[in-house]
């Protein structure tokens, strides 16, 4: 219907144009210009009445013709009251930050914008200061949808002085417990496992009393890489499965998967000296169901993992996957209780918990010390 109106109007315009052209080349009576002007005025009026307007293409929700919603993006979920963050500070916090800048070292605390940075670096309520140092550079070869770390297929080569710098820095801070993690380095022949091992060994040589948790990538499931790091002298071998089995492909890089991660944790338990703890972590609020969480916990426990942590997924930026749900503190408590009933030696579960959050708290430290005393 609308297109037929356009054709009629176009035909009338052509007729008017021909008459206008004819009047410019021939001499007519004085009444011709008057007739032409009347025809043009009539066409303008008809065009104004029949031309399509904005309302022909959209349905308006209000009297304001231009008050329309653009796009289909969902509004982000508002943060609930229990997700408040504390402001970093304290003498130990300042000391650690200054030393990091001097030695050009990276921490996952800063790279991942962890909300617990201030509490961990300053020692929090227990006075046990912890930090998570990120080695092998600040650029990852993978691109998980939840992670804020930079990515590249060809990141810069590792700094050969990094193991020494990291060991000396941590030894000077007097930390009771440190987490050493790294980006994925699929570009390196040994996935960075040699660099990781050297860092742990140098720190243990300088400060044997410091408990070391190595939060490692999956090394693409390479048993030789896992064995090398497991026997480096660490106290806790950690590798995160990140989310429930059903959401792996939606959350993690395509080179990571649930089975591969479980295999890494089982290999670590086999290769590491007796008394070495294994640990993993998952984020909640990515779209998982309670049943999926429980099934994942059962499989992790069956793999012999000692420690498991649960925390709320927090979207680092608008470029990352949105938060599907904010899990209540009560739900986190239930998963903690269930985990202990399943046989995990320790479960940390709460909205603000991260894989290395309060890693050096008194309970875990006491557990490691107790195990060693019993075996000696």
Curated annotation (Swiss-Prot):
Residues that bind [4Fe-4S] cluster 1: 109, 114, 120, 356
EC number(s) stated in the UniProt entry for this protein: 2.8.1.8
KW 4Fe-4S (keyword) present: yes
GO cellular component term of the entry, any: mitochondrion
SUPFAM superfamilies: Radical SAM enzymes
Other noteworthy facts: This protein may be expected to contain an N-terminal transit peptide but none has been predicted.
Species assigned in the record: Pisum sativum
Entry-linked HAMAP family: Lipoyl_synth, Lipoyl_synth_plantM
Protein keywords: 4Fe-4S, Iron, Iron-sulfur, Metal-binding, Mitochondrion, S-adenosyl-L-methionine, Transferase
Top-level EC class: transferase
Any GO molecular function: lipoate synthase activity
Localization: Mitochondrion
Protein name as catalogued: Lipoyl synthase 1, mitochondrial
């Amino acid at each position: 219907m609308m297109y037929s109106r356009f054709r009629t109007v176009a035909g009338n315009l052509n007729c008017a144009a021909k008459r206008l052209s004819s009047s410019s080349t021939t001499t007519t009576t004085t009444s011709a210009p008057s007739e032409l002007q009347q025809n043009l005025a009539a066409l303008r009026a008809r065009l104004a009445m029949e031309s399509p307007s904005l309302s022909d293409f959209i349905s308006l929700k209000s009297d304001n013709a231009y008050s329309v919603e653009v796009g289909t993006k969902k509004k982000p979920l508002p943060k609930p009251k229990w997700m408040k963050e504390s402001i970093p500070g304290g003498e130990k916090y300042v000391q650690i930050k200054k030393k990091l800048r001097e030695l050009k070292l990276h921490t996952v605390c800063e790279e991942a914008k962890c909300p617990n940075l201030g509490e961990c670096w300053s020692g929090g309520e227990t006075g046990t200061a912890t930090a998570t140092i990120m080695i092998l550079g600040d650029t990852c070869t993978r691109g998980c949808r939840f992670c804020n770390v930079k990515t590249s297929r060809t990141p810069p080569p590792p700094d050969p002085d990094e193991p020494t710098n990291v060991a000396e820095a941590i030894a000077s801070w007097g930390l009771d417990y440190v987490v050493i993690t790294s980006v994925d380095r699929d570009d390196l022949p040994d996935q960075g496992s040699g660099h990781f091992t050297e860092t742990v060994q140098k720190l243990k040589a300088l400060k044997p009393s410091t408990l070391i948790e190595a939060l490692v990538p999956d090394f693409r499931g390479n048993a030789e890489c896992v064995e090398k790091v497991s026997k480096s002298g660490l106290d806790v071998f950690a590798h995160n499965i990140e989310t429930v089995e059903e959401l792996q492909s939606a959350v993690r890089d395509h080179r990571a998967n649930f089975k591969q991660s479980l295999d890494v944790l089982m290999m670590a338990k086999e290769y590491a000296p007796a008394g070495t703890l294994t640990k993993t972590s998952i984020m909640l609020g990515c779209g998982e169901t309670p049943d999926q969480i429980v099934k994942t916990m059962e499989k992790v426990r069956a793999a012999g993992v000692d420690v498991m942590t649960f925390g709320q997924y927090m979207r680092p930026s608008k470029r990352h996957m949105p938060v599907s749900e904010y899990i209540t503190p009560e739900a986190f408590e239930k998963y903690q209780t269930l985990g202990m009933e399943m046989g995990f030696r320790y479960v940390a579960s709460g909205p603000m918990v991260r894989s290395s959050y309060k890693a050096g708290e008194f309970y875990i430290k006491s557990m490691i010390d107790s195990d060693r005393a019993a075996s000696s």
